[in-house]
Amino acid sequence: MIDKTIPLVDLHRHLDGNVNVKTIWELGHQHGIQLPANSLEELAPFVQIQGKENNLVDFLKKLDWMVAVLADLDAVKRVAYENVIDAASQGLDYAELRFSPYYMAMNHNLPIEGVVEAVIDGVRAGVKEHDISVNLIGIMSRSFGQEKCRLELEGILAHRDSIVAMDLAGDELGFPGDLFTEHFKRVRDAGLQVTAHAGEAAGAESMWQAINILGATRIGHGVNAIHDPKLMEYLAKHRIGIESCPTSNLHTSTVKDYDVHPLRKFMDAGVLIGLNTDDPGVSAIDIAHEYRVVKSEMGFSDSQLATLQRNGVEMAFMSDSDRKALYAKKAK
């Protein structure tokens, strides 16, 4: 199912959406934070999906307990470190971990730049110990407004040499991309790549904004592109990568079921698209799960799965030399 000769990657993976339940429990008790449960078993439903949520905003509430326990920068570093361990244990050769520094900082008034530093330090520590390559993507959480996003951007740009790209995430309907035009001009001027959550809760127009105004060369989710033939044609022609997260789309009620997910329509249209986990801690999945459901629920062949796997490598925010090295590693 997963082709061992092709690098296995996960490009849309939220670091702050992947905090182990045991870690939440331990950090909560360590810092005297009142948790909504009296045991690990009772805590799980508060931080993991037990079925489907009504919408994206309800889904995102599951993440709130994951950041509520980040009481100091050591906790942030621990979570970042454990994310690398988790990714490596799932057999990933390469991962892009994305995080929102303000979202991680806000509950305990941590310094935003300090959060960025702690994430970088935690990831570096994990990479030193495990056979995996990791790049970081900063997030501006649009739900908190333009000023908070500016503060996030400042913290990220202070460490731009350790970050490969910037993302826009959060309430897509309430905070459209054009509110962040100036933010992303600074991102591009700094030489960072751009991806954006778009076409998930909102329609195709959100994706056009992400591409034409923000400068996105990749789109997170993008399921609603299928309603705009011109957009589908544009995505294919210009090789705009779609970071597809099928199980997450099901959990947020973005799609009703796997068999109606537009993944196949993207592939049939020649769009560059790969599989990702999104918030694996919330969805309680790994990347292998996504390949399994695409095969069993959507009827993809092993050859088609290999194409998706290869697409992920081609979409990755890395240099051509690093890409060649990643392929060479699997060829040994």
Swiss-Prot record:
Assigned keywords, A-Z: Hydrolase, Metal-binding, Nucleotide metabolism, Zinc
Binding positions (substrate): H14, D16, G170, D279
Cofactor: Zn(2+)
GO cellular component terms attached to this protein's record: cytosol
Domain of life (superkingdom): Bacteria
Active site annotation, chain numbering: E200
Enzyme type, top EC level: hydrolase
HAMAP family in the cross-refs: A_deaminase
Functional description taken from the UniProt entry: Catalyzes the hydrolytic deamination of adenosine and 2-deoxyadenosine.
Similarity comment: family membership: Belongs to the metallo-dependent hydrolases superfamily. Adenosine and AMP deaminases family. Adenosine deaminase subfamily.
This protein's name: Adenosine deaminase
Native source organism of the sequence: Shewanella frigidimarina (strain NCIMB 400)
Gene: add
